[in-house]
Amino acid sequence: MKFVDEAFIDVAAGDGGNGCVSFRHEKYKEFGGPNGGDGGRGGHVFAVADPNLNTLVDFRYSRRHEAKRGEHGMGSDMFGAAGADITLKMPVGTIISDADTGELLYELLTPGEVVTIAKGGDGGFGNLRFKSAINRAPRQKTPGWPGERKSLKLELKVLADVGLLGMPNAGKSTFIAAVSNARPKIADYPFTTLHPNLGVVRVGPEQSFVVADIPGLIEGASEGAGLGHQFLRHLQRTRLLLHVVDMAPFDESVDPVAQAKAIVAELKKYDTQLYEKPRWLVLNKLDMVPAEERAARVKDFVKRFKWKGPVFEISALTREGCEPLVQSIFQHVHAQQLAQNAPAEVDPRFAGEPPRG
């Protein structure tokens, strides 16, 4: 399925139904009182986070979404029925913002989460509402209120634990295919990956994490060059970044250290918070480096790159070194999950007190 991570839609909640002017007509009762009912409220527009969806492509082809208006009030004290609501299914991780102002409105972060993106208008009052001791036969009524109308921008940020960074052709797609259930397109030319790929890496029973592979970055990406800048937002919710470096480029004039520094510079320009995320260095394609040269080449790279973080030497093609990397990633992600879900510290002044009920 084609991955679409941005869409624009127009939503319109239903208008409220109008109130009714009506009077009782009974035999032998010349002046029956008012019995005009209120109009029904207009339908709401909801959005629900559906874990079975991973793209916004459907909203590219159906831009306008309208709920039904409420029914008008009727005589005999009959109120109008509420208009039918509509629910739009969106992938988990969708950000909903105002298309005109850019204001962030909602984030759908948990499966099944429901938000009201446009409220239906209230129904108008029938003349029954205006009866008083002074006015026994009111002929007033009010129209229904209009429903909310909004132009919205939908933006999808994938919810992955680990994000892959690197130049085009660094071997990110080969790595994600080697360690996960993802099957991205792989070829020996740059820009093979044109949209994000998600893969679930299973470490053991009930032990897994999600990896996101985005199109490769090039110099100037933060200003819009290449493809990767469009998808950098997907890395903002990850717990860990893997910086994948091609240690055996086809073009011998290409310096892996210069490429790696360019990636880090683009990351810093794009988003400081993203730049400060935990980041590990993954030196790939070492199977193409003569065995006697590997240690010296890795040492030289780390020294010139001035890297002080974790370093992993792998070959995604032969899967050499992938298993220790996967185990280390899981331990890191699992530790962060435990820290995030840890119970809040109890104030010692209230420790041991029975719950009040």
UniProtKB/Swiss-Prot annotation:
Its main location: cytoplasm. Keywords: Cytoplasm, GTP-binding, Hydrolase, Magnesium, Metal-binding, Nucleotide-binding. Its EC number is 3.6.5.-. NCBIfam families: Obg_CgtA, PRK12296.1, PRK12297.1, PRK12299.1. This is GTPase Obg. GO terms for molecular function: GTP binding; GTPase activity; magnesium ion binding. The lineage of its organism: Bacteria, Pseudomonadati, Pseudomonadota, Betaproteobacteria, Burkholderiales. It is found in: Cytoplasm. One of its GO terms (cellular component) is cytoplasm. Pfam families: GTP1_OBG, MMR_HSR1. PROSITE patterns: G_OBG, GTP1_OBG, OBG. An essential GTPase which binds GTP, GDP and possibly (p)ppGpp with moderate affinity, with high nucleotide exchange rates and a fairly low GTP hydrolysis rate. Plays a role in control of the cell cycle, stress response, ribosome biogenesis and in those bacteria that undergo differentiation, in morphogenesis control. The gene is obg. Belongs to the TRAFAC class OBG-HflX-like GTPase superfamily. OBG GTPase family. InterPro entries: G_OBG (IPR031167), GTP-bd (IPR006073), GTP-bd_Obg/CgtA (IPR014100), GTP1-OBG_CS (IPR006074), GTP1_OBG_dom (IPR006169), GTP1_OBG_dom_sf (IPR036726), OBG_GTPase (IPR045086), P-loop_NTPase (IPR027417). Its cofactor is Mg(2+). Monomer. Residues 1-159 form the Obg domain. The keyword RNA-binding does not apply.
